[in-house]
Amino acid sequence: MRVGIGIDVHQFVENRKLIIGGIEIPHTMGLKGHSDADVLLHAISDALLGAAALGDIGKHFPDTSPDFKDIDSRILLRHVGKLIADEGYTIVNIDSMLLMERPKVAPYIVAMRESIAECLDIETSRVSVKATTNEKLGYIGRQEGAAAHAVCLIEEK
C-alpha cells in the first residue's frame, strides 16, 4: 500500500466560473488558473500521482502548454486514474478537504464525490470530500482564494 498527499491553492477572480470537484457552483467569482482551476481535483490528482511516485500535475499537464488552457480538470483526473492503473495500482480511498469561506459547498458535496468517483472508475464510497472555513483568517478568510488538501491510499492490483 502507498499513501499520497496533494495540496492546491487558487486565487479568486471575477469573470470565471467556479468549478470544484467537477461541479459548477454558483458564485460571483471563480478561481484563476491555466485550466478550469478546479482546486479539489488538482489536489486529488497530485495525491494520486505522488502515491505512485509519478511526479505532480505540473509535470504531466504543464501550465505552459496551450493543450491544457481552460481544460476541464475531470479530463486530467481521468488521465491520472489511467496512469495509476497502468502502473498496476488500484485506488483504495481518497480523503479530501476544501478550505474556503464562501460559497458554502455542503449542498454540492454528494455531486462532487460522484463526479470524482466517475472520473476514477471507483465506488463513491471510496471518495470523501469535506469542507471548512479558515475562520476569516489569512487569504482564505479574506476570500481571496481557496485551497484543497487530499490524501489517498493505493495498492498493487
Curated annotation (Swiss-Prot):
GO terms, molecular function: 2-C-methyl-D-erythritol 2,4-cyclodiphosphate synthase activity; metal ion binding
Site (Transition state stabilizer): 34, 133
Superkingdom to which the source organism belongs: Bacteria
Presence of keyword Amino-acid biosynthesis: no
Pathway the protein takes part in: Isoprenoid biosynthesis; isopentenyl diphosphate biosynthesis via DXP pathway; isopentenyl diphosphate from 1-deoxy-D-xylulose 5-phosphate: step 4/6
UniProt-listed InterPro entries: MECDP_synthase (IPR003526), MECDP_synthase_CS (IPR020555), MECDP_synthase_sf (IPR036571)
Cofactor note (record): Binds 1 divalent metal cation per subunit.
CDD domains assigned: MECDP_synthase (cd00554)
Residues given in the record as 4-CDP-2-C-methyl-D-erythritol 2-phosphate binding sites: 8-10, 34-35, 56-58, 132-135, 142
BP terms from Gene Ontology: isopentenyl diphosphate biosynthetic process, methylerythritol 4-phosphate pathway; terpenoid biosynthetic process
Cofactor: a divalent metal cation
Cross-referenced Pfam families: YgbB
Keyword list, A-Z: Isoprene biosynthesis, Lyase, Metal-binding
Reactions it catalyzes: 4-CDP-2-C-methyl-D-erythritol 2-phosphate = 2-C-methyl-D-erythritol 2,4-cyclic diphosphate + CMP
Record PROSITE patterns: ISPF
Top-rank EC class of the record's enzyme: lyase
Similarity comment: Belongs to the IspF family.
Subunit structure: Homotrimer.
Function: Involved in the biosynthesis of isopentenyl diphosphate (IPP) and dimethylallyl diphosphate (DMAPP), two major building blocks of isoprenoid compounds. Catalyzes the conversion of 4-diphosphocytidyl-2-C-methyl-D-erythritol 2-phosphate (CDP-ME2P) to 2-C-methyl-D-erythritol 2,4-cyclodiphosphate (ME-CPP) with a corresponding release of cytidine 5-monophosphate (CMP).
The protein's name: 2-C-methyl-D-erythritol 2,4-cyclodiphosphate synthase
